[in-house]
């Protein structure tokens, strides 16, 4: 990876310090005190040996085991000082590794027990005494393509907290100043005090003061941004939307090639070219609140963020395009690093505020202006909608529990919008447990009350129809009963599959096979009648059907004639006693 010549400072290595940053999240992960060789010496040696063969060039940062950062020490203790990988503690990106079992040797001759890859880290040189707090010296305007990295825009000390930044707000007593202050977007929930900080941009015209965040860390690298980095290295976890409707962007061709180093910037005649990568601010000749309301009312329905060209410090300016917006209504987007970057990029939905809500709110989060849902949020919403539809379906099921099966299934089908995708369990209620297909002429087996389709039952009873066991509970099937309502419901809801199974069943030879049933006896003397049991309902294990099975109960009102029972009773004492009683009754009622 090509390193900039500015990495090497003119000061002595003793006075110089440096830091390494993660290539993905741009967070500081180590300092020069944690390495066996000072960072600057390695950078100088690397610049001198760029023409040397790659095998003889060191591509690792060799770390001193006695002065490791805290996060690396924790990883070593967790791995018990054996072998492992070094990942960024902030974003989890791969940075290097360690090996104390068989310590390898680097091409430079040093032991690579604990090392970081140079291709996965970014070096940043800083002044002594400011390892974690380098001053922000080079911050070019996003509209200036080149030549701004060597301009000193702001010189100021670092703040006391790491994640502390200040947002420049327009403070004026006129109408535009108050409206600008009301429309200022807050990234944090609390206001921060301005201590020993200067504004990054000062406008000579009091009516035009653009919003520019001023970071306290100032960790702006003096070289070109990493090829995989996406934004300026600032400790800000949000994005700012700068509304050009407050500044009336004009199309004057006046150019402002360079920025002043120390003095305030006069933006009265500034008109940077507005292209795919940047937009410019310009002082408006006048301000009309009605025009602002009109501009807000015709805001585009959907916008699409387009990443722009990176500047020397990694500050990106993106122009947000729309089908209904012109060049004067393009908002200025500062792409700052945040964990929620996908909220603005990975979604196609957007919510807009009304004009009154937009003007009334003095501070509101970014999501209310340009709120887009990522994949995880959309999945949660879909799950919530499915649960709500399921609850409504269950309520309807309890409400229509007294109607017939066909009507009940019709009501439940109306409550379901997506039959097979949203509620696959409803189709499972119409599937046979043997063939895993929809029911075709379903039969209920007695005494286990399990339901199977006709082709499956005939196939099971092909060899032994008199003692066919149930495929689920292995109970001998004595009788089967056709379920007419279930058959009609299946035919109504799954017509194509039902007809397909019917055609295949009629063409096959299984239609001639018998159904499972035990040997039948005949009633002797008509039997003794008993009182019918009340109507009961049963929940079947493989489906959600509740059916009356009064007529499916054991019809044992008569005496079943069986030769085995006759033989047993002949050789029993009960038969003899019964015969004696019968003779006595005949003698008593029919005397001779």
From Swiss-Prot:
Main localisation: endoplasmic reticulum
Chain positions found as Phosphoserine: 231
One GO cellular component term: endoplasmic reticulum membrane
Coiled-coil regions listed in the entry: none
Transmembrane residue ranges: 565-585
EC number: 2.3.2.27
Residues covered by region (Interaction with ZIC2): 282-489
Subcellular location: Endoplasmic reticulum membrane; Nucleus envelope
UniProt cross-references to InterPro entries, sorted A to Z: RNF180, RNF180_C, Znf_RING, Znf_RING/FYVE/PHD, Znf_RING_CS
Catalysed reaction, written as an equation: S-ubiquitinyl-[E2 ubiquitin-conjugating enzyme]-L-cysteine + [acceptor protein]-L-lysine = [E2 ubiquitin-conjugating enzyme]-L-cysteine + N(6)-ubiquitinyl-[acceptor protein]-L-lysine
Name the record gives this protein: E3 ubiquitin-protein ligase RNF180
Originating organism: Mus musculus
Species classification: Eukaryota, Metazoa, Chordata, Craniata, Vertebrata
